[in-house]
Every structure is written in C-alpha cells, then in structure tokens.
Amino acid sequence: MLLPKWQTELKRCKKFLLPVFNKFDTYNWEDVEENVRKGRWFLLALPNSAMLIEFLEYPRKRVLYVLAAGGSLEEIIKAESDVISIGESRECDSIEIRGRLGFEKIAKKRKGWKKQYTAFSMSLKDV
C-alpha cells in the first residue's frame, strides 16, 4: 500500500524527532502521527533533520512555534530562512522555539533571537 507523502516523510524523520519526545515524555509517536494527520502540526522535513511546527493563536498574537527539532543542528540552523518564510506566509507575529540549555549560545549568535523566558519543571511523582 502506498502511503501519503506526509506519512512517508514523517516515517523517515521519526529517527530525528522521536528522541525529542522521548526526552520529555509528553507525546508518544502515535500522538505525533495523529497531530500531523489532523493538521495541528506541520512537518518540515530536511535531508538529515526535521522540525514539527504548530501555529499558536493568542488574542493579540499569532506565533509559529517550533515544537520539536532534531537531527543535524547545522541543517536546522540553515533552515531558519524557510521557517521565517513559513511564518510570514501564515501572518505570524513571531517565532518561538524551546531548546536545550546549550541552544541559548546558538540563538545569541543569530540575528533577531532573544531569550523570552526560562522554564522549570518538577515531577509531582518526586514530591
């Protein structure tokens, strides 16, 4: 059976994206497939990496949110102009991405990026 193109690409990109979801334990792969299939998330498939994009709607702002990115960091950084173009075409006001602590060093070197907030988490299982 021939799979739709998005499904074929998502399957190919699983090796790049799954580690992100495994690290935070927020979604399993079936959740990822369902959100892409339903059009909630959009796959930006690159040769050696991938990103999942979500559009967030606030009362006064529309945000392109990079939910997950994995694979070649160099390739992801080079895709910045593509992400900007997607955001502009969808009339977004800004782009947001969460990253590992080390990503702050990379973002500081890129034009236009600034640190918005710091997130902390605590498992209630440990309390």
Which positions does each model-derived feature cover?
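Short intrinsically disordered terminal tails
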Residues: 1, 125-127
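Short amphipathic alpha-helix that is part of the acyltransferase structural core
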Residues: 1-27
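Active-site rim helix/loop that mediates acceptor-substrate recognition in acyltransferases
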Residues: 21-40
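Conserved donor-binding loop and adjoining core beta-sheet/short helix segment
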Residues: 37-74
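Short secondary-structure junctions
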Residues: 42, 109-116
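Short glycine/proline-enriched coil/turn segments at helix->beta-strand junctions
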Residues: 45-49, 89-92, 114
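Acyl-donor binding region in acyl/amide transferases
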Residues: 61-110
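Conserved catalytic-core motifs of GNAT/GCN5-like acyltransferases
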Residues: 114-125
